[in-house]
Amino acid sequence: MAYRKMLKSKIHRACVTQADLDYEGSITISPELLKVANILPYEAVNVWNITAGTRFETYAITGEKGSTDICVNGAAAHLVTPGDLVIIASFTQILEEDCAAHEPTVVFVDQFNRLKEIRPERIGVKSRIPNPA
C-alpha cells in the first residue's frame, strides 16, 4: 500500500499577534480555530509567512478559549513580526487510491483572526497576468 502526504487543512491569512522568543516553541492558536481546522494540540504544522516569505515547521498548542491570538513561540519567533499574515497548514497520510477524492479544508479568518468561512480547497490558481493572446 502506498501513501501520499496530502494537505489536510489550513488556516488562511491569519495575523500574527505575538512572537515570544522565551517560550519553548510552538504556535499558539485558539481552541475554536484548532477545532474547525481539525488540528490537534501538539500536531505538527507548517507556517508560511505571506508577509516575509519565511517558512517553518512547528507544532500547535491550544490558546485561551475565545482568544484571537496567533502567537509564534521559541526560535521561530525570529521568523515573524506581529502583524505578519501567515498560512498555518496541517498534513495527513492518505492511501494513494483515496487521494483523488480527498478535499482539504480551508479556514478563512478576518484581519482579527475571527472565523470568516470554512470550505474545501478549490483546485486552480487564478492568474493575475493577462493572457497575451
Swiss-Prot record:
Its EC number is 4.1.1.11. Is synthesized initially as an inactive proenzyme, which is activated by self-cleavage at a specific serine bond to produce a beta-subunit with a hydroxyl group at its C-terminus and an alpha-subunit with a pyruvoyl group at its N-terminus. Keywords: Autocatalytic cleavage, Cytoplasm, Decarboxylase, Lyase, Pantothenate biosynthesis, Pyruvate, Schiff base, Zymogen. Disulfide bonds: none annotated. Substrate binds at residues 58, 74-76. Its main location: cytoplasm. The keyword Oxidoreductase does not apply. The active site is at 26 (schiff-base intermediate with substrate), 59 (proton donor). InterPro entries: Asp_de-COase-like_dom_sf, Asp_decarbox. One of its GO terms (cellular component) is cytosol. The keyword Oxidoreductase does not apply. The modification Pyruvic acid (Ser) is found at residue 26. Catalyzes the pyruvoyl-dependent decarboxylation of aspartate to produce beta-alanine. This is Aspartate 1-decarboxylase. The lineage of its organism: Bacteria, Pseudomonadati, Pseudomonadota, Gammaproteobacteria, Legionellales. The gene is panD.
